[in-house]
Amino acid sequence: MVPSLLNLPFAELEVGQHLYWQIGNLNLHGQVFLSSWVVIGLLLLLVVSGTRKMERDPKGVQNLLEYLWDYLRELAREQIGEKAYRDWLPFVGTLFLFIFVCNWGGALIPWRLVELPNGELGAPTADINTTVAMALLVSLSYFYAGLSRKGLRYFEYYVEPTPIMLPFKIIEDFTKPLSLSFRLFGNILADELVVAVLAFLVPVLVPLPAMFLGLFTSAIQALIFATLAANYIGEAVHEEAH
């Protein structure tokens, strides 16, 4: 019974296998760097192709980029506020586009065609190191935003409306990056595993609904991450009316 189960296709699925690059005493996840470079290359190609010949009446890729710009500008303005959103629009937009292409790339790019000595390529956002790094970057960004706009007055936030709130707001600073990173990582990894298992069990047509659902949830996760990042920055720069 046990040997027969081990021979099933889904028994070949491996989780947590990595291609390591050793630099000094550091072990880096090589496949995450490789897939991230592919994503960055795709984004650069998209931007170059859409801005190479700008037209007054936008078409094709230029039209898509202008639509994305308008959408992200409104998102940043709504979450951060009129006074500060322009400074942070490039950051929020870059987060959204990178996560969006990472998530969709995990479902649409045939990563398995590239053979590695160990592990396999996939969405960079399905690796906890990637999502934690981005979440910590968001935390540093809203600290910087608050301090650069308010100076030391930023720390008044921790004792308002009463000093009793100090420990809770310190804990909040730790839970924000945790929730950002694990939400994105968990959703993208779960999508990839569900599609992989279905593709092994029933390779024809059956995985397609799960793939389409994964594309939808991947887009939503990119939007949630970017919106929360903008919201945290907006909270840091917000001036209370007196």
UniProtKB/Swiss-Prot annotation:
It is a multi-pass membrane protein. PROSITE patterns: ATPASE_A (PS00449). One of its GO terms (molecular function) is proton-transporting ATP synthase activity, rotational mechanism. Gene3D superfamilies: ATP synthase, F0 complex, subunit A. Its main location: membrane. The keyword Phosphoprotein does not apply. SUPFAM superfamilies: F1F0 ATP synthase subunit A. InterPro entries: ATP_syn_F0_a_bact/chloroplast (IPR045082), ATP_synth_F0_asu (IPR000568), ATP_synth_F0_asu_AS (IPR023011), F0_ATP_A_sf (IPR035908). Pfam families: ATP-synt_A. Keywords: ATP synthesis, CF(0), Hydrogen ion transport, Ion transport, Membrane, Thylakoid, Transmembrane, Transmembrane helix, Transport. GO terms for cellular component: plasma membrane-derived thylakoid membrane; proton-transporting ATP synthase complex. It is found in: Cellular thylakoid membrane. The chain crosses the membrane at residues 28-48, 89-109, 128-148, 193-213, 214-234. F-type ATPases have 2 components, CF(1) - the catalytic core - and CF(0) - the membrane proton channel. CF(1) has five subunits: alpha(3), beta(3), gamma(1), delta(1), epsilon(1). CF(0) has four main subunits: a, b, b' and c. Belongs to the ATPase A chain family. NCBIfam families: ATP_synt_6_or_A. HAMAP family: ATP_synth_a_bact (MF_01393). Key component of the proton channel; it plays a direct role in the translocation of protons across the membrane. This is ATP synthase subunit a. The gene is atpB.
